[in-house]
Regions:
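Blade-loop segments of beta-propeller domains
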Residues: 105-141, 148-159
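Beta-strand-rich domains and repeat architectures in extracellular enzymes and scaffolds
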Residues: 64-96, 111-123, 272
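Hydrophobic, well-structured mid-protein blocks that either form specific transmembrane helices
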Residues: 139-197
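Short loop/turn segments that connect beta-strands within beta-propeller blades
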Residues: 101-105, 143-147, 183-186, 228-232, ...
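Beta-rich, blade/repeat-based domains predominating
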Residues: 71-82, 115-125, 155-167, 172, ...
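A short beta-strand motif characteristic of beta-propeller blades
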Residues: 63-68, 106-112, 148-153, 190-198, ...
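Conserved beta-strand positions in repeat-built beta-propeller and related beta-rich domains
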Residues: 86-92, 129-136, 171-175, 216-220, ...
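A short helix->beta-strand "capping" segment at the edge of beta-propeller domains
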Residues: 51-72, 102-106
Length: 285
């Protein structure tokens, strides 16, 4: 059969249109399928911690100076910024975000959390302070200067400690795992199991990023561990027993909880819940 030029062109155009639609529909199906796969695919499980052949080393420390600390403050988070301490406190009805004068322990600025919220760790990411809560599943985002609320995130599970490594917010939840979270969305990017002498280390609490390491206190102890952020291995630790004299303790739940680091001077500050003092300490390398 001989086709005229006009009919042949029409058939080619129709055939071309058919194939374009076929390609388009195929692309949509592939994209939808891939998107569903992406959404359904969970985070990759954390890699197992490497075998630690050398036991964690106990580091020597000494007190450089002691400062007054508000005994009403149930300290849950601590950091140093702009010449002052930023402190997050806990307990329902008493949870606050505070800016504190180092020399006097006086509260220069504060923001009350909702009465039903038990405040926990706090971290500075850019010009925003992020403060988490214990069992409320709420992370509050505050303006660093005014303490005005500028956002809030929801998350699953408990919140204990929080710090920022310059790229991710790092959160503890009382288990032996840390979660690395996007500072813009608070979504988990990866998790890190923590081990101490090849054993899972639970009750990881308040966190501080210090010179490429995660420093953390272990709840219900006076121990501070230094965690490798890549492997989760604790290579060294500080036994801070005796830092606060027993005579200065009230007998309440006043365990060590609060680590702050001055990046400009290298000073390290430590305090605890309801402690009457905050200490600057020096640590051996």
């Amino acid at each position: 059969m001989v086709l005229s030029g006009k009919i042949f062109c029409i058939m080619l155009l129709r055939l071309r249109t058919f194939w374009l639609w076929a390609i388009f529909v195929s692309a949509v199906i592939i994209a939808v399928g891939w998107n569903q796969r992406e959404r359904a695919q969970p985070l990759a499980p954390p890699l197992p911690a490497p075998v630690q052949t050398t036991p964690a080393r106990a580091l020597k420390w000494s007190v450089v100076k002691a400062y007054p600390h508000d005994t009403i403050a149930f300290t849950q988070g601590l950091l140093w910024h702009g010449g002052h301490l930023i402190e997050g406190t806990g307990r329902e009805g008493h949870s606050e975000l505070r800016r504190v004068a180092l020399s006097t322990g006086g509260v220069l600025q504060k923001r009350q959390l909702p009465d039903d919220v038990f405040g926990e760790g706090v971290a500075l990411a850019g010009n925003r302070l992020v403060q988490i809560s214990w069992q409320n599943g709420r992370a509050f985002v505050w303006d660093e200067k005014t303490f005005a609320k500028i956002g809030e995130w929801k998350y699953d599970g408990e919140g204990w400690g929080l710090t920022f490594d310059g790229e991710n917010l790092i959160m503890s939840d009382g288990s032996d795992e840390l979660s690395f979270r996007d500072p813009k969305t608070f979504k988990i990017q990866r998790t890190l199991p923590v081990t101490f002498n090849n054993q899972p280390l639970k009750n990881i609490n308040e966190l501080e990023w210090i010179e490429g390491e995660i420093w953390a206190n272990v709840w219900q102890t006076d121990c501070i561990v230094r965690i490798d952020p890549q492997t989760g291995v604790v290579k060294s630790y500080l036994d801070c027993s005796g830092l606060l004299d027993n005579k200065a303790r009230s007998g309440r739940e006043d365990v060590l909880n609060g680590i702050a680091y001055d990046t400009q001077t290298g000073r390290i500050f430590i305090t605890g819940k309801w402690w009457p003092k905050l200490f600057e300490i020096a640590v051996e390398n």
